[in-house]
UniProtKB/Swiss-Prot annotation:
The lineage of its organism: Bacteria, Bacillati, Mycoplasmatota, Mollicutes, Acholeplasmatales. The active site is at residue 170. Belongs to the thymidylate synthase family. Bacterial-type ThyA subfamily. This is Thymidylate synthase. Homodimer. It catalyses: dUMP + (6R)-5,10-methylene-5,6,7,8-tetrahydrofolate = 7,8-dihydrofolate + dTMP. It comes from Aster yellows witches'-broom phytoplasma (strain AYWB).
Length: 288
């Protein structure tokens, strides 16, 4: 994953310090592209240990069209907790619960989760019901019927609903491309947290590419990651510098259950990661 480390180095060399919405501060560049050939391995970062369980469950959650953190919390995935908690803190129902106490209530009380665990019409809603259109179903059908189409688009950015979302989509637009029996995917990401978010996104959309390729009888080929504002938060600089000093290891292999022919039939047990060697965990606070 030298490709990722090159991004980190580029930001340190060329980036500008900027204020941001979270008041954390970032070092940022605008406009950057990375390419990952999935024939060379599954691009899961090796210069720190990645939480693959969270990556898989979040992607399945998107594909279900779900927007409530209940499913994630039930599966011990905590990457979205801060946003509904922040909204809950501003409500009349808030009783000075800590984030940990809030998550426990979400996990153990489905009614509480229904009322306070929703993120609004974020990714899953837009993927499966963008103003009445199931984009995932359309994409898969179109890839099969018209693989040369230049309209194989998945869009998460719905301007009419942005003010209802806990966090407007960061990874906003996906385009698929078919050539000689191989499927590629390009993601445009308007905003990317280089330490926490981007390694997660690389693996997630590479996995989506593999899943769509399998159900359309194609071979997964290239994931292209195009970034708008790519930034390192000021409280992540030390962790990123540590990664730059580490030597990337050989990429692992991701094996999908070959019996799955429908995108909606994938379950957590249908993914097996082999030969993943990595450095230790590096932690960092998320900017909300």
């Amino acid at each position: 994953m030298n490709t990722y480390l090159d991004l980190c180095r580029f930001i340190f060399q060329k980036g500008s310090f900027r204020k941001d919405r979270t008041n954390t501060g970032t070092k940022s560049v605008f406009g950057y592209q990375m390419r990952f050939n999935l024939e060379e391995g599954f691009p899961l970062l090796t210069t720190k240990k990645m939480n693959l369980r969270s990556i898989i469950h979040e992607l399945l959650w998107f594909l279900k069209g779900d927007t409530n953190i209940f499913y994630l919390v039930q599966n011990n995935v905590n990457i979205w907790n801060e946003w509904p908690y922040q909204k809950y803190q501003q409500s009349d129902f808030f009783q000075n619960e800590t984030l940990k106490e809030f998550v426990k209530k979400i996990k153990n009380d489905p009614l509480f989760a229904t009322k306070h665990g929703n993120l609004g019409p974020v990714y899953g809603k837009q993927w499966r019901d963008f103003n009445g259109v199931d984009q995932i179903k359309f994409l898969i059908s179109e890839i099969k019927a018209n693989p040369n189409s230049r309209r194989l688009i998945l869009n998460s950015w719905n301007p009419s609903l942005l003010n209802q979302m806990a966090l407007p989509p960061c990874h906003v637009l996906i385009q698929f491309y078919v050539h000689q029996g191989k499927l590629s995917l390009q993601l445009y990401q308007r905003s990317g947290d280089v330490f926490l978010g981007i390694p997660f996104n690389i693996a997630s959309y590479s996995l989506l590419l593999m899943m769509v390729a399998q159900v359309t009888n194609l071979q997964p080929y290239e994931f292209i990651h195009t970034l708008g504002d790519a930034h390192i938060y000021s409280n992540h600089i030390t962790q990123v510098q540590t990664q730059i000093q580490r030597t990337p290891k050989k990429l692992p292999q991701m094996i999908l259950n070959p019996d799955i022919k429908n995108i909606d039939d994938f379950k957590f047990i249908d993914f097996i990661l082999k030969n993943y060697q990595c450095d230790g965990i590096l932690k960092g606070d998320i900017a909300v």
